Structures are given as C-alpha cells and as structure tokens.
Amino acid sequence: MASGKEIRGKIKSVENTKKITKAMEMVAASKMRKAQDRMHAARPYSDKIRNIAANLSQANPEYTHPFLVKSDASKTVGFIIVTTDKGLCGGMNTNSLRIVTTKLRELEAEGKKVEAVAIGNKGLGFLNRIGARVVSHAVQIGDTPHLDKLIGPVKVMLDAYQDGKLDAVYVVYTKFINTMKQEPMMEQLLPLAVDKLKADEDSLAWDYIYEPDAQTVIDELLVRYVEALIFQAVAENLASEQSARMVAMKSASDNAGSVISELKLVYNKTRQAAITKELSEIVAGAAAV
C-alpha cells in the first residue's frame, strides 16, 4: 500500500488537473454560445442566395451552369473535409473521419480516384497518414472563421469540377444538433441538387431585371452559394467542436472528482491503519513492561 505522503501527492496532482479541465469547460461554454450565434447568423445569407439563384435558374431554363451538370467522365471524386485544429473534443473528429474512410473504400472498389481539401489540422494529418492526395488545405482557422481563409482551397475544388476534372464533390463536417448531440455529415456539394434550387411561388411571380445579364449573375451567384454552404459547414463544425469540448471537459472534471474521493478514502484508510499499528505497538510495549 502506498504511503500517506504519496497518496497526498496524487490527490494534489488530480486536483490541479481538475482545475484545468474545469477552466477549459467554462471557456468552451463561452465560445460555444458565440459559435452558435455565428452559425445561426450565416444561414439567412445562404438561404437568400439560394432563393435568388433558384429564381434565375427557373426563369432561364435554357442555360445550364456546370455546377448543375452531372458527369462521370473523370472517375475522380473530390472531398472537402472539415475537422478541428485542436483535440480534446471527444470522438468528434474520429466519427467524421470514420465515414470518410468508409466512403473512400467504396470509391476504391469502384475504381475511382480521390482528391481532397482539408480544413483543419486533424483532417490534414489523417489524410497525410493514409496517403490521400491533398490538393489544398486551410488550417488555424481560429474561433472566428473568415471566408477569406477558405476561398483559396475551396476554389481549387470548384475550378477542378468546372473543368471536368471531378465527377462530384462532397463536404464532410460535424453538424450541430444541440449541446449534447453532434452528428457527422457527408453531403454532396456538387453537382448541386436540383430540388435545393426550387424557387418559391411568390418569387417567381416577380419579373426581375438582371444586369449585365441573367447568365452572368447565375455564374456569380452559384459560386457564392457553394462558398456559403462550405462556410456554413465550417460554422456548424466550430459550434460542434466547442460543444463537444465542453461536454468532454465536464466529464473529465467529474471523473477527476471521483478519483479524488477514492484517493481520499484510501488515504484515510492508510492513516487509520498507521494509527492502529502505533497504538498496538504502544499497548504491546506497555504489556511487556
């Protein structure tokens, strides 16, 4: 059995760890609320662009943008994989990368190649370990994502699809459901689903005038729409990260509390045993006299 001094040292060590995890839990809770606000604020922008693009597409059926055309010519599929830059957020990244691994095996069985863009250090490290072809990446996004940091890597994928080098583009991220639940998602980004670009009846009743022309506006809007979808995925992933980290740190703090209680019980038993032994020795000594 360990000595009382050793047990006290362990208790002190676990208490210090608990202070750290508790502080990280509080920081993550604060960041989570801000991340949720950014996530909700990004949705109206993408919804409005989608409505305008849908109106244009249905009002000009004779023009078909490359983002709406499905192709099977290149036998290459693109992935935009959104993960975190840091760890200590439970199994969030593991769950996302697990569905990526499953999809990669399916594509390999079909004889298709894969090109990937990594957003986040964890995804980049994973892709490098498995030997995937990473065409671009963005790391150190921070707690406040900016589209400026994402446009470069995203444009690589969009240009490749527009040039016919990719058959499809998927985005993988963790969707924020609530504080206790986050779900890994894999969604087809390109070609755009036609059902997502259906205009409301009210918007079709208006006859808009577009300058310089409808085709130019469609070209620009669809690119902005796809960028908005990716930004939304990053915002969702960030909210999920902070939520998962808060839950993980709370669990760590609770576990540390349990360990401290157990160590204190062991310490008290050890101390009681030492006292009992000393008393026995005193009694034995007195009897001998």
UniProtKB/Swiss-Prot annotation:
Taxonomic superkingdom: Bacteria
InterPro entries: ATP_synth_F1_ATPase_gsu (IPR035968), ATP_synth_F1_gsu (IPR000131), ATP_synth_F1_gsu_CS (IPR023632)
A GO molecular function held by the record: proton-transporting ATP synthase activity, rotational mechanism
Pfam families, per database record: ATP-synt
Keywords from the named record: ATP synthesis, Cell inner membrane, Cell membrane, CF(1), Hydrogen ion transport, Ion transport, Membrane, Transport
Topology term for the membrane: Peripheral membrane protein
Predominant location: membrane
GO terms classed as biological process: proton motive force-driven plasma membrane ATP synthesis
One of the record's GO cellular component terms: proton-transporting ATP synthase complex
Compartments, as annotated in UniProt: Cell inner membrane
Stored Gene3D superfamilies: 3.40.1380.10, ATP synthase, gamma subunit, helix hairpin domain (1.10.287.80)
Subunit text: F-type ATPases have 2 components, CF(1) - the catalytic core - and CF(0) - the membrane proton channel. CF(1) has five subunits: alpha(3), beta(3), gamma(1), delta(1), epsilon(1). CF(0) has three main subunits: a, b and c.
Function of the protein: Produces ATP from ADP in the presence of a proton gradient across the membrane. The gamma chain is believed to be important in regulating ATPase activity and the flow of protons through the CF(0) complex.
Family assignment from sequence similarity: Belongs to the ATPase gamma chain family.
Protein name, per record: ATP synthase gamma chain
Name of encoding gene: atpG
